[in-house]
Curated annotation (Swiss-Prot):
UniProt name for this protein: Chaperone protein ClpB
Repeat 2: annotated span: 83-146
Signal peptide: none
Record organism: Shigella flexneri
Annotated function: Part of a stress-induced multi-chaperone system, it is involved in the recovery of the cell from heat-induced damage, in cooperation with DnaK, DnaJ and GrpE. Acts before DnaK, in the processing of protein aggregates. Protein binding stimulates the ATPase activity; ATP hydrolysis unfolds the denatured protein aggregates, which probably helps expose new hydrophobic binding sites on the surface of ClpB-bound aggregates, contributing to the solubilization and refolding of denatured protein aggregates by DnaK.
Domain notes: The Clp repeat (R) domain probably functions as a substrate-discriminating domain, recruiting aggregated proteins to the ClpB hexamer and/or stabilizing bound proteins. The NBD2 domain is responsible for oligomerization, whereas the NBD1 domain stabilizes the hexamer probably in an ATP-dependent manner. The movement of the coiled-coil domain is essential for ClpB ability to rescue proteins from an aggregated state, probably by pulling apart large aggregated proteins, which are bound between the coiled-coils motifs of adjacent ClpB subunits in the functional hexamer.
InterPro entries: AAA+_ATPase, ATPase_AAA_core, Chaperonin_ClpB, Clp_ATPase_C, Clp_N_dom_sf, Clp_R_dom, ClpA/B, ClpA/B_CS1
Residue ranges of the region described as Linker: 341-545
Top-level lineage group: Bacteria
Cellular location(s): Cytoplasm
CDD domains reported in the protein's UniProt record: AAA, RecA-like_ClpB_Hsp104-like
Amino acid sequence: MRLDRLTNKFQLALADAQSLALGHDNQFIEPLHLMSALLNQEGGSVSPLLTSAGINAGQLRTDINQALNRLPQVEGTGGDVQPSQDLVRVLNLCDKLAQKRGDNFISSELFVLAALESRGTLADILKATGATTANITQAIEQMRGGESVNDQGAEDQRQALKKYTIDLTERAEQGKLDPVIGRDEEIRRTIQVLQRRTKNNPVLIGEPGVGKTAIVEGLAQRIINGEVPEGLKGRRVLALDMGALVAGAKYRGEFEERLKGVLNDLAKQEGNVILFIDELHTMVGAGKADGAMDAGNMLKPALARGELHCVGATTLDEYRQYIEKDAALERRFQKVFVAEPSVQDTIAILRGVKERFELLHHVQITDPAIVAAATLSHRYIADRQLPDKAIDLIDEAASSIRMQIDSKPEELDRLDRRIIQLKLEQQALMKESDEASKKRLDMLNEELSDKERQYSELEEEWKAEKASLSGTQTIKAELEQAKIAIEQARRVGDLARMSELQYGKIPELEKQLEAATQLEGKTMRLLRNKVTDAEIAEVLARWTGIPVSRMMESEREKLLRMEQELHHRVIGQNEAVDAVSNAIRRSRAGLADPNRPIGSFLFLGPTGVGKTELCKALANFMFDSDEAMVRIDMSEFMEKHSVSRLVGAPPGYVGYEEGGYLTEAVRRRPYSVILLDEVEKAHPDVFNILLQVLDDGRLTDGQGRTVDFRNTVVIMTSNLGSDLIQERFGELDYAHMKELVLGVVSHNFRPEFINRIDEVVVFHPLGEQHIASIAQIQLKRLYKRLEERGYEIHISDEALKLLSENGYDPVYGARPLKRAIQQQIENPLAQQILSGELVPGKVIRLEVNEDRIVAVQ
């Protein structure tokens, strides 16, 4: 018999049988060796064949191994083993059986039939385990589905459904799928489409994270619970595993061969299987190379004939990009749109999946946490969908609580570090012999014993609390298993088991859980095991940088004295500081309009009066850093074409992928201060873009993504009307001054732009009394720089007065003061430090000498 007529799997098994014979020191390769190799072959046909025939493959393996151990062993064969006469006879019989069936190649399942028909040890073992020619022949027919073996790789295509799909109905029976809450309309629509005669293939389309895959899992659960029409009862839902289908397909045509195997197996099932293809768009173009047919085209005939019941799932963008372009594929699917659930529906979904997260993380998730996860994620996470983003919040909050439970509590950790510190000191003092050291050692020993006692008591308490928590989790896990068991009993109609669980085990476990929970509530001091709305807010703040947690007392006080904080840096300008402070307080108190930015202001005034400085002070107050603001110099946007830099270039232009300067900055940091400096210098088209930001708190970038501006403070500065402010300052009160300036502003900006700004703030010119305070603020920065180099500096009142007089200019504001400090203080100081006149460690005094500021030590 020619060995090249064996299929690939059979040839591999023969090589394995040779190795097995060598390993057992047998002189010949017996049928037993080959049968053992076939049984243990990964992805082989023999093991599933025997299972299909109702034979215990495990028992057969044991019997064959015992028979192998009884075979005669020969030492010094030198690695040369030959097939025995028995094996040659069985292989020839395989050839005969293959020819009878019209096969071009000999497949491994025929070896079992041939072994039964020939006499020998293997035939006796097979018959003892219940194998007969009749049941093996029937199992072979069932496996082949009326097909012949026409190529060497035929066996690789078998069991394709088992290799390349995941059985969702089986997972639902085992209770491994999360419960699906709501989505009744979408599941009903999917069932309606599946019940059609032709084109019975629904495709679920929706944004990422709305629960498309969950709908199919819900369908699988309904099928096993019998909550579907007669036409769908008993069906299996199989999810196609594209990763397994593509992985390892090295040669041209191998992928197509595997997919063809899946489609053939599905055809054999005669409509009893619903195939679920997640990320359906991956099928279009999969396996395509140099004009080869892709997976999408291979599916079309089966879909059109109704042989394949398929449910697809893909996102809106990918459906448009891949499926709609292929009209022939699109018409074979029926669209089922899956919308994002409302906040109320999301709360119901979260309540349904809550128990799974509690079991995994061993924590308790409170109802306020669930409500907070749904409402806060809906408001603050704009670029993702419910319920996915809310589930992620719950998951991460539970994970952080679990991490705290597993790690040592802070109180214990602090005591532990203190004990180590005291022990080190004790070791050092034991080497000393003087009286003071001995006295200190006695005191130290006393403190050490006290700390160790405290530590052991706390450790006991911590261990008891951990044990209490793990006890609760064990009961919860048992209760979950009991609920799965009652469902399984209900499906098979085992009433005795149902009553035993429903009226015996489950009430008992619930009673135990209630008792354990009460005990847990009383004793918990070191460990937190509850996820509350505060934890959800913490996680959200970490994700987005938006402070949504309840305000601590310190933050309340800080917000109430916000004006004083800002006045440390911005001198005068009370109206501007009040306007900004009130906007921030409204936002943190939850009174601001949720669909607009926190505040939008137009700062008007002469140069150098503190417009930009107030923005920096606000960023510092909110984020502890001057850099935490998006600063855009509008003088860069004077040309019409430069507007696209703010939101990103349109498709087809260079830089399209990079995104916009303004939109990208806000996407990365949604809670920020946006400063549009010198806004009147920008092109008028820029203001058209800003209208959406100021009114609705959103902006669409060049790639079509909506960017959320609702948590930003938008501040625009301008010099418009500054000449009026300079001229009439002192003559008019603030209200009249503002009215005059607004008249100038209305000539430069459109009414719809001014109308959308929360407040237009007019800055006063600075007086001499303000300049002295500003001089002190600027000198403090100089003192800080000198302190780092070891110099201490003081300025006399006369020197400060002279500096203020020299630095005051009503037209240019505070900027000339900076130049005065540079020329009159910094330049002479630099020379004296470099020449060695001023040395570190001694106080430098700045005094007036002949109308000049001099530094002396």
